[in-house]
C-alpha cells in the first residue's frame, strides 16, 4: 500500500441478466474446504460476473498493525496529529482480505461516503473504495460511518466460484452489514451460519444454498 491503490483489473459487476450473480452476498466456507487460507472464512463478494469474482475475507484480522499506525506509516497523518475515527467503533479494523495482491488496500464501507469514479456501490448500503483519499477522509473525520480496511483480496477465475459452490465448498447468503463491519472477528463465522438457520455443531459437508 505504498502506492495509490485502485480497482484496475478486478472483475466488473455484471449487468442485469438471467444469470444469478453473488454480488453483495456472504460466502461461508464449508468444513470440506481444503485450502487452509479459506478455512472457516466469511467472504463478502464485491464483484461477480462471467469474468470471475472478487471478494474480501471479513473475519481475518491482520493483527500486526492497527489503523492509526498504518495512517502514520503512509504519511497520511503526521506523528502527534489526532485522528478522527468513524462513529461506529474506536478504530477501523485491518483485515487480511485474501491471498491476492496483499500489498493493495481495499476499504469496505457504508454508503454515506463515495468518491466519483473510484467507489463501487455493491449492495445493501455497502461500497468498496480503493484509493488513499478514503483513508485521508477517515483520518480527518469526514469518511464513512462504518469501514474496514482489507489488505489483499480473494479472486476466482471465470466459472471457478460456481464450480466450488457446486462441489460443496461454500454456502452463501445475503450480507448483513453488522457481520461485515462487526468488531468481533471470532463470532462472524457462526453468526453467518445462524443467519441461514444452520447450527455450527450440526453442519455437514452437504451442499446448501440460502
UniProtKB/Swiss-Prot annotation:
<dbReference type="GO" id="GO:0005829">
    <property type="term" value="C:cytosol"/>
</dbReference>
<protein>
    <recommendedName>
        <fullName>UPF0301 protein OCAR_7326/OCA5_c07920</fullName>
    </recommendedName>
</protein>
<dbReference type="Pfam" id="PF02622">
    <property type="entry name" value="DUF179"/>
</dbReference>
<dbReference type="InterPro" id="IPR003774">
    <property type="entry name" value="AlgH-like"/>
</dbReference>
<comment type="similarity">
    <text>Belongs to the UPF0301 (AlgH) family.</text>
</comment>
Amino acid at each position: 500500500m505504498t502506492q495509490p491503490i485502485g480497482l484496475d483489473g478486478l472483475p466488473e459487476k455484471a449487468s442485469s441478466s438471467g444469470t444469478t450473480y453473488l454480488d453483495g452476498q456472504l460466502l461461508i466456507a464449508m468444513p470440506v474446504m481444503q485450502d487452509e487460507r479459506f478455512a472457516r472464512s466469511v467472504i463478502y463478494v464485491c464483484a461477480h460476473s462471467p469474468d470471475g469474482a472478487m471478494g474480501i475475507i471479513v473475519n481475518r484480522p491482520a493483527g500486526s498493525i492497527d489503523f492509526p499506525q498504518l495512517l502514520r506509516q503512509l504519511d497520511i497523518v503526521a506523528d502527534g496529529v489526532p485522528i478522527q475515527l468513524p462513529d461506529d467503533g474506536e478504530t477501523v479494523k485491518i483485515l487480511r482480505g485474501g491471498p491476492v495482491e496483499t500489498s493493495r488496500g481495499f476499504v469496505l464501507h457504508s454508503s454515506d461516503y463515495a468518491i466519483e469514479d473510484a467507489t463501487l456501490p455493491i449492495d445493501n448500503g455497502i461500497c468498496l473504495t480503493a484509493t488513499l483519499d478514503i483513508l485521508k477522509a477517515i483520518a480527518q473525520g469526514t469518511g464513512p460511518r462504518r469501514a474496514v480496511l482489507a489488505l489483499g483480496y480473494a479472486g476466482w477465475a471465470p466459472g471457478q466460484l460456481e464450480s466450488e459452490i457446486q462441489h460443496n465448498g461454500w454456502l452463501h447468503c445475503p450480507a448483513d452489514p453488522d457481520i461485515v463491519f462487526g468488531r468481533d472477528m471470532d463470532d462472524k463465522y457462526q453468526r453467518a451460519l445462524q443467519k441461514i438457520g444452520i447450527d455450527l455443531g450440526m453442519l455437514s459437508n452437504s451442499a446448501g444454498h440460502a
